[in-house]
Regions:
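C-terminal motif of bacterial Sec signal peptides marking the signal peptidase cleavage site
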Residues: 20-23
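Acidic, contiguous N-terminal accessory segments
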Residues: 25-27, 66-75, 79-172, 208, ...
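Short, low-complexity, disordered segments immediately C-terminal to signal peptides
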Residues: 25-49, 53
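Feature activates predominantly on carbohydrate-active enzymes
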Residues: 113, 121-124, 128, 164-360, ...
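Structured mid-domain segments that build the active-site/substrate or prosthetic-cofactor binding neighborhood
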Residues: 299, 303-306, 314, 420-528
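Aromatic-lined carbohydrate-recognition surfaces of secreted/lumenal glycan-active proteins
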Residues: 362-388, 439-446, 476-481
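Substrate-binding cleft/loops of secretory-pathway carbohydrate-active enzymes
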Residues: 379-407, 452-460, 485-494
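Catalytic domains of carbohydrate-active enzymes that cleave complex glycans
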Residues: 500-653
Length: 653
């Protein structure tokens, strides 16, 4: 179980010697600091790697407090698995030095009364340093060596200058006068800096909501001349998968920075990119009408404009922390268009695209609110019939164009001009990049038609994020299975996508190294069986359906019969056997559970190629595992049937 870490606060005399402690506002005004202290652990390490299951619901957890020693109980319904991949001495990290000084000699300094996200990340720094080294613990005495988190009274001119060079929600890590500083341009950046230090030096891997791993390292030296600064490429990063969407801690660890679905107060997470009201398909709601797909308003009707403008102001007034207001078309099916009245059509014909009338409308909204709501952007979609950029109209400076890739192929990279679907999208993004300073992307990273089918897009994820970076994209929204936990690779895919958004400059080799590391620690010793499954089905899928979209059913990617007209039972059974072997090789019950949950996709594959009786048998297995692991949806907005009889099972086909 997690060890209870009690914070002790220095005596009044010591506080006076360090400087009177005051609060720090959200503008990063320097404040005095509180010392958290260190000491050598006396815990007896175990001799073998452990998988520790902890429940914050029933455990005491440490909280950095303002001048008092306090133990707080945090409500949570999720158990976290912390796997310590230990050295021979039973400790994940035998030796950690900072600037040549052993970690045991360091104390932790954090801004008193500062943002909750900074103080929470300091809590986690203490927790994982103690777990990793068995040497970092709280002590009452001060030290000549400090780890300084955020804006404090320890700031030197060198630190202030380094902080000023940080952009967006990035951070800098550097040594100065015997202190290691981790600080950002904002509170959220400081939090991310702490998590990056834990990942880059301590070997912590925040793999999933329920799984954090400390990997084996014998010795780590943080050099005395360390000076690392990370400035994010994308100002907005949103990995829109279930755990990222609904668990703020998971999103924070992943460095996702949108908060429209968060129940956590914005200040507690250090701010972020937030929407006023709904974040997409808002045009009917802004007219006080119920949402209706495939129906669009007349964008040259003055009454429509004035009503939308009035409600835009109301939404912004009700959400003063929001930085974006979405004024976006209703969802629509392929081939559907917007208003076809003479006035709208005249603009569209002149601009060569229905985006003509939409962008005229959006620019007018943006101009009318810019003085009253400085720093707020109007977001609209380039989606379906509005995807093509207009000939002469350019987005206003406070307009965001969110270009959507829903029609694209996801077994070819978006930059691959040999793919006809992606060639057209490439032309569109190039046109938008030439006229738009605030270009966001809405990308699709899952199969919306069948949640249980392997989606063979892992080989293009790195390429596609590179593609966005190279076309001046400033924000990325990656839609995934957001309505339910998944029986495919939700945890792996969202982990890799978040890594790419935070660091799109990583090499392809680094991307695949992250993939292999995740598979190893999340699924256990049989991870190579799972990698073989992924590789085999990716190649098989490309062969039988070279252009995979997000609405393709499983049997289109993995046909029930082979080229000779025979059932593909051998392929599907071979793939299931790989999962069964991985299950047997998994070392812990948690890893076995991960394997079993993700094996749903293999049972569904067997269903695709089976006889009538076999199909029902495998679907019953799929259904049973979905019930066991709380999987509530089998496709986009389609919940699982409420029983496992044959009639209801047919809906899963």
């Amino acid at each position: 179980m997690k060890k209870k870490l009690l914070l002790t606060i220095l005596s009044c005399l010591l506080l006076l010697s360090l400087g009177l402690l005051t609060s720090c506002d959200s503008g990063n005004t320097p404040a005095d600091s509180t010392v958290e202290g260190t000491s050598t652990s006396t815990d007896t390490p175990t001799d073998t790697p452990t998988a520790e299951v902890t429940s914050p619901t029933t455990e005491d957890t440490e909280e950095i407090t303002d001048g008092t020693t306090e133990v707080a109980t945090e409500e949570d319904t999720t158990e976290e698995i912390t796997t310590e991949a230990e050295t021979d001495d039973g400790i994940p990290l035998n030796n950690l030095t900072i600037g040549g000084v052993d970690i045991q000699n360091y104390t932790l300094v954090v801004q008193e009364g500062g943002a909750a996200c900074v103080r929470n990340s300091a809590d986690e720094l203490i927790e994982y340093l103690e777990k990793a080294t068995a040497g970092f613990r709280i002590e009452e005495k001060a030290s000549d060596y400090e780890i300084v988190i955020g804006v404090t009274d320890r700031d030197t001119d060198k630190i202030k200058a380094a902080r000023e060079a940080v952009e967006l929600d990035g951070y800098t890590l550097l040594m100065d006068e015997g202190r290691l500083y981790i600080t950002g341009s904002c509170d959220r950046g400081t939090m991310y800096g702490v998590y990056c230090f834990l990942e880059d030096y301590i070997g912590v891997r925040f793999l999933a909501k329920d799984t954090t791993v400390i990997i084996n390292q014998d010795s780590v030296e943080v050099p005395a001349d360390v000076h690392t600064t990370h400035n994010p490429v994308f100002e907005m990063r949103d990995t829109y998968w279930y755990d990222m969407r609904y668990d703020q801690t998971t999103a924070n660890h992943a460095k996702d920075n949108s908060f429209y679905d968060s129940s956590t107060p914005v200040a507690d997470i250090g701010g972020g990119i937030g929407y006023a009201g709904r974040f997409v398909h808002t045009i009917n709601l802004l007219q006080d009408l119920p949402y209706q797909g495939n129906v669009q308003p007349c964008l040259t009707d003055e009454a429509v404009y004035q009503l939308v403008l009035s409600n835009v102001r109301k939404w912004l007034d009700a959400n003063p922390e929001a930085t974006i207001i979405s004024v976006s078309q209703n969802d629509s099916d392929p081939g559907k268009l917007g208003c076809q009245c003479a006035n709208c059509k005249a603009i569209d014909d002149r601009e060569g695209t229905p985006m003509g009338s939409l962008l005229t409308f959006i620019n007018r909204i943006a101009n009318d609110i810019k003085d009253d709501y400085p720093g707020v952007y109007v977001d609209t979609l380039a989606y379906r019939y509005t995807r093509k950029a207009p000939k002469t109209i350019k987005p206003a400076d406070n307009v965001i164009i969110r270009l959507c890739s829903i029609e694209c192929c996801f077994t070819h990279a978006l930059s691959d001009e040999s793919c006809s679907k992606n060639k057209a999208f490439k032309e569109d993004i190039e046109a938008w990049a030439a006229i738009c300073d605030n270009l966001y992307i809405w990308d699709y990273t899952y199969n919306a038609e069948t949640y249980f089918t392997f989606f063979p897009n892992f080989d293009v994820l790195w390429n596609n994020v590179q593609f966005y970076k190279n076309h001046n994209v400033t924000g990325v929204f990656l839609e995934g299975q957001q309505v339910s936990v998944s029986g495919e690779f939700a945890e792996l895919r969202s982990y890799l996508l978040a890594k790419l958004l935070w660091d799109p400059d990583m090499t392809k080799e680094e991307y695949y190294a992250y993939m292999d590391e995740f598979l190893q620690y999340y699924y256990g010793a049989g991870w190579e069986k799972i990698k073989e499954y992924m590789t085999t089905l990716t190649e098989h899928g490309k062969k039988h359906n070279p252009h995979v979209g997000i609405f393709d059913k499983g049997d289109k990617m993995f046909p029930a019969v082979d080229d000779k007209g025979k059932r593909n039972t051998k392929l599907s059974r071979d793939m299931l056997d790989l999962w069964l072997e991985a299950y047997e090789l998994a070392e812990t019950e948690e890893q076995k559970a991960h394997v079993e949950k993700s094996s749903i996709q293999a049972y569904y594959l067997c269903h695709l190629s089976g006889s009538s009786a076999e199909r029902i048998k495998y679907l019953k297995k799929v259904y049973a595992l979905c019930e066991k692991y709380g999987i509530e949806y089998y496709k986009y907005v389609q919940p699982m049937p409420d029983s496992s009889n044959s009639n209801n099972l047919n809906s899963l086909i």
